Amino acid sequence: MVRTGWPMEYLARSLDSYKNMPKENLILFPHRIAPEKQPDIFRDLPTQLPDYEFIVCQDQVLTKNEYHNLLGRAKIVFSANLQETLGISWYEGALVDTIPMVPDRLSYQEMGLEEFKYPSEWTASFKAYTHHKEAITERIKDYIENYDNYIPLIRKQVTKLKNDFFSGKKLYEGIIS
């Protein structure tokens, strides 16, 4: 038996042209609009942080290029997901130096660096979010205001994801041997 990742070696190359775009104080919700993704939490955040731009990607009809341009301009990709199998959108974001802000649950527990995970209970429900709203907004402010300091960690996150979760290298080696 060979433990391998999901073969996505092509993704880094396909996003290269979006990597060095000027960053804006933009936070994205790149998930589908579904109850388990908790878009209501994300939609409430602009009331606390009016100086930042928040975009729910599925609220627009975006081409792949338009979506990737948003990723390239954004400083944060936000998740409050209650269901996640692999999480490709946060990997796409990290590939273009966008900070992934993810709960410490689901696949994120194993895949995410501690610096990008927040306590699971902060977004366990909308009610829980209301109790932890200040902590979440402070984390977002820190990521936005200190963005450049996080770039080395984003790249470390990309290396971990690329090598351990989004590579078919072990599978290919197993087939060849």
What label would you give each PLM region?
Residues M1-D16:
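Donor nucleotide-sugar binding/catalytic pocket of nucleotide-sugar-dependent glycosyltransferases
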Residues Y18-K37, R43-T47:
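Conserved donor-binding/catalytic core segment of Leloir-type glycosyltransferases
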Residues H68-A74:
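Short alpha-helical donor nucleotide-sugar binding micro-motif in glycosyltransferases
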Residues V77-F78:
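A short hydrophobic beta-strand element within the catalytic core of glycosyltransferases
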Residues N81-L82:
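Aromatic "clamp/platform" in nucleotide-sugar-dependent glycosyltransferases that forms part
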Residues G87-W90:
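Short glycine/serine-rich donor-binding loops of glycosyltransferases
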Residues I99-V102, Q109:
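Short hydrophobic beta-strand element within catalytic cores of glycosyltransferases
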Residues T123-I176:
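A charged, aromatic-enriched C-terminal amphipathic alpha-helix characteristic of glycosyltransferases
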